[in-house]
């Protein structure tokens, strides 16, 4: 799973869908 923390996301890997969706 991914978790957004302000200006970045963390999660299982760098290609987490939440990070893609948010432009990270």
Curated annotation (Swiss-Prot):
GO terms for molecular function: calcium channel regulator activity; toxin activity. Keywords: Calcium channel impairing toxin, Disulfide bond, Ion channel impairing toxin, Neurotoxin, Secreted, Toxin, Voltage-gated calcium channel impairing toxin. It is found in: Secreted. Disulfide bonds are present. InterPro entries: Toxin_34 (IPR013605). Expressed by the venom gland. GO terms for cellular component: extracellular region. The keyword Cytoplasm does not apply. Belongs to the neurotoxin 04 (omega-agtx) family. 03 (type II/III omega-agtx) subfamily. Omega-agatoxins are antagonists of voltage-gated calcium channels (Cav). This is U4-ctenitoxin-Co1b. It comes from Ctenus ornatus (Brazilian spider).
């Amino acid at each position: 799973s991914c978790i957004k923390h302000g200006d970045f996301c963390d999660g299982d890997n760098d290609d987490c869908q939440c990070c893609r969706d948010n432009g990270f």
